[in-house]
Amino acid sequence: MSSSTNGHSQSNFAKFAFNIYGTLSTTSSSTPQSHEISPSPSSSLSSSRSRRNKQSFRAATGHRLTYQCDKETISLSQLNYPLQVGGYGTELHSIVIGGKNYLRLLCISESQQRIIDDINLLESKSIYNSRVGSKLININTIKTYESTIATGLSNGVVSVYKISPNGQGKQTGRFSDHKRTINSLDFIESENQLLSGSQDGTIKLWDLRSSSSKPSITIQASMRSDPIRACQYSPHSSVKNKMCVLSVHDSGALCKFDLRSTGGNGNIYSPEKKWNLHTGPALSLHIHPEKEYVITGGRDQRISVFNYGEGQSNSSTPENTIITYGPVLKVRWSSYSNISQSGDEFEEAQSSLSPSKINPLYNYDIACSYLNDDPTVAIYNLSRKYVPKQIIHSKKPIQNFIWARNGHRDRNIWTLTKSNTFNSYNLDQIDEYDVSRPLDDLNNVAVAWDNNGNFSMANQDKYDFELDDNDIYDRPEGSSEAEVASHGMDPEESGNAIHFHNSATTSPVEKAALARSYTHNPMSAIQLPTKSPLPIGRNGTGFLGHDMSLPNISTRPKLTRNTSQTTQDSSVSYGSAYPIPQSANSNTTLHMKRNIISNSTKSSNTSAYVIPVVLPIVSNDEFVFKKLSSEYLVKLPDGFTMIDVCLLNASTAASVNSNRTCQVWRLLAVSLQEHFDSQKAPMTIEELEKQQMEQNENEEGVPNATVESATDSMPAKSVSSVLGNFVESYKTNSSFGTGSQINKPGKSVKSRTSSGVNLMDKINLASRTSSFSKTSFKFKEKEGVDEDGVPEDKEKQERGKAEDQETENDKKSIHSNQEPIVIRTTRHSKVEDLDDENLNIANSMAMKSSPTSVGISLPSSHTFSSSIASSPQPIRGQIPPKQQLATTRESPVHNWLDQKKNELFRGRNVVPAISGLSLALKSSNNGDEKLLTRAWKFKNLLRKSLDYAMLQGDVIFCSTAAILFYEFAEDTISEYEYLEWVSLYIDILQKKKLFVTAINILNSTAGSIKSKLQKIYSVDLDLRFYCSNCETLLVNEKSQMSQKGEFGYWYCDECNKLQSKCVYCNEPCKGLAVVVGLKCGHQGHFGCLKEWFIQDENMECPGGCDYQIL
């Protein structure tokens, strides 16, 4: 390809050939692309070549520079060397991109808005690439200096290229002394000396003028191989007659070498200084442009700012640390300072102060990219290190980035994504849609909860952050607040401000709606002129009856120091400056704005305040949480069923007075029992008669002496509904009708869903002592009226005789402890009344006859006669009295059937048969299942209980119920809800240091959920120990390399002191010894303390501190 042809002489073939190497597009123009692409389709070639002033360049920054590479790319750099390409003779900026068999030089314009030409440097002819032209070349890193380009390959080779003024490249050197991948390159003060750091743990210094292929100096941090991730020459050390090189390693250490302190063979085997700044591999470093500071980033999600100068050599901890949200892959200082540019209000306030009072590290921003396919680049500033200043968002993960140099000192960042796309971002451009500013989206007021249910509210102006009281708030001694507020303004404006304060505080009409925005200090020595509170000027709180023409100079009110922080110079307890309200006719200039910000910053005593709030929330009691979380059953013990677990959880909830949760667990147990019973096949009349005959035969053959034992041991053959037994237990609390009821104590009955103990009796026993027993649900027994409202005068006498006879035979019958259930005909024997047309009438009648019973539920099988059903009265209207219902005539056939039924099944427990209509509706697939779903089904009750618990924030109930019933009701509890509840529950348990309970919850989850949770919470721990004396990381590499004595971490190589000694034997605690720490602070071996306290029976600490242990 011809790279130096003129734009006027380009042909169509040249355009097609040029597109092979990538898309040189910076605009969305539909015109054909050429070697020179202008930012606008209407701009001509001649106009694009003309030089423009600064304003025209900034006006044309609406188009982003992008380039799509045709091969896999890894490395990125910038070449600042004048090239004469495409008819341009000015100083151009060039982009160097490297990858797999890829090394291109992209020539761009001075405005960095369009690409002039691209050059393939691998096609250059030389003696080095002619013999190995077909081999794979994988360029891992690139470094440039003037016209020299150095590349580090993945096979340990360093290649050097020279660029001529016409843009042609030629390979001039090839060095292959490294054994593994080259990770970092850097030039030393000129283009003739080159540093290379490799994965093999060595740094080599190359003399590019020499014909030898061997390095001049080889540097190694230790005898064992510690891979070098990055290395850089320090330009600030030449002033002190030194040549310092810094490097970071996989061990997390930062090493400092002096190239002039080499041995006789020209090699260095130990660093001059070494600092352990990271708890994992350190992946990047970059030296400050002006000071002897270095920033390092590592996989431990930290960015460390460290002073490596001679005066700070004894320091082992970084001066600043930025906690990021991911492992840091690359970190860079900005190319230009922020002093010359006009930024936001915070930077304006900082620049208005004295330069000597500003930290010089604040002048430069820090950019970092992240590991693990993160598509962002975060820009930080040490003045606000907790919140990113800006964030660049990319569609694909970012592979590499650099700060771009330009003639306008703009903050430009060039990125290279894993989709092989080059992008340029201008951080000074406001309308950059892929650059966000998190500080602008944050609120001034924030609320945070702690683990004990208390919360704190923080109130802070977003531009006032960590301002030094001694340096910035230099208020003159003896000056008043009003004088400080008006300081820096014109005398007329100052007088207006004070006049507003005197007038506004005396008028109750002009007082702001927000009465107090500050905290009163009772120790204040200065009294306000009036007793009315000071009005606060805010956006959104107007002042009635006020009309002033002051400029918009109101600042956000600030809170002063607390009583413990009050000094002689800060005795005023009210807000900073006396605020001035907004005016509708305000036109604030930039000079006025910066002046007011500067003076208001000086006048305030503090920039933020935190208000802790303690709320004794009953539902968030610490004791209740610990008891429920530790005693709730989340899995089935041996010999227990799901119903047993629900009842035990109900008793646990009742023990902490959580009555509603207790009743929910009981309700779920009853509903679950009914669900199991409904799965049984209904019994026909013939089966019931056969079973009854077998029972009569057994009764005749059993002696009277063994009746009681048989009752306890023989399994119950009755399969009556447990719901009937449950509601029958409440007959002693309320009644229906005028007749008496027969209540017999029943014994435990086993079913196939129980564990040998009648759990319903536990419910009845516990419910009688609770407030819920007064509103219990029960079946009514009509004694003067049958199911159709027909009188039973003739049957009363027969029933009375039968009851007397049954009372005498109670001791002989093994079924005497069970309540009789009347068997209805097919027309009345429906367990589930699906239409339920008479439920409201039955309930109304029950409420009228028994006003003291709050909740009465009648069986759905009650059917009234046609005379009642055809009544013109509405459902909720007045129901005829019971005597009127009793006079209704009944058919003879019904009387005959009831008589035969009572004679056959009197005193026997049977299961009501399900009607054919219900069976047909259940087996029909044409009906709507939603219409057939009953509200008291188990899954419906479970869903309603979970929804209510979510609204109440009951994470314990949600998590416990999800773990117990997820496999049973997968259609009710989704997998997302399961993961959300359980993961949140585990997080809370870990915050409360209930680690055993958290592990129990994790192990009790379902198999598919457990594997996902284990990836989050079951991770390997990387423990790092620090010296208790000098607070340095315990590495002890010196003693490990010397291999003398017993190696361990019970001593420190830096301060040569032991970490801990036994208070009893005064020997170091090392090895696998168990160390016990006492409350007084002393510690010792477990065996020593056991001998002191247990065998010798001492009560005080053996260290002589007179602390009574027992």
From Swiss-Prot:
Region (Disordered): 27-57, 552-575, 692-714, 734-755, 779-819
Domain of life from the UniProt record: Eukaryota
InterPro entries the UniProt entry points to: WD40/YVTN_repeat-like_dom_sf, WD40_repeat_CS, WD40_repeat_dom_sf, WD40_rpt, WDR24, WDR59_RTC1-like_RING_Znf, Znf_RING
Compositional bias (Low complexity): 38-48
Zinc fingers (RING-type), renumbered ranges: 1062-1105
GO cellular component: cytosol; GATOR2 complex; vacuolar membrane
WD repeat start and end residues: 132-171, 177-216, 223-267, 277-316, 348-390, 393-426, 439-483, 637-675, 860-906
Xref: Gene3D superfamilies: YVTN repeat-like/Quinoprotein amine dehydrogenase
Classification via CDD domains: mRING-H2-C3H3C2_Mio-like
Record has Metal-binding as a keyword: yes
Subcellular compartments: Vacuole
Zinc-finger as UniProt keyword: yes
GO biological process terms held by the UniProt record: positive regulation of macroautophagy; positive regulation of TORC1 signaling
Biased composition (Basic and acidic residues): 791-813
Similarity field: Belongs to the WD repeat RTC1 family.
Protein name: Restriction of telomere capping protein 1
Source organism of this protein record: Candida tropicalis (strain ATCC MYA-3404 / T1) (Yeast)
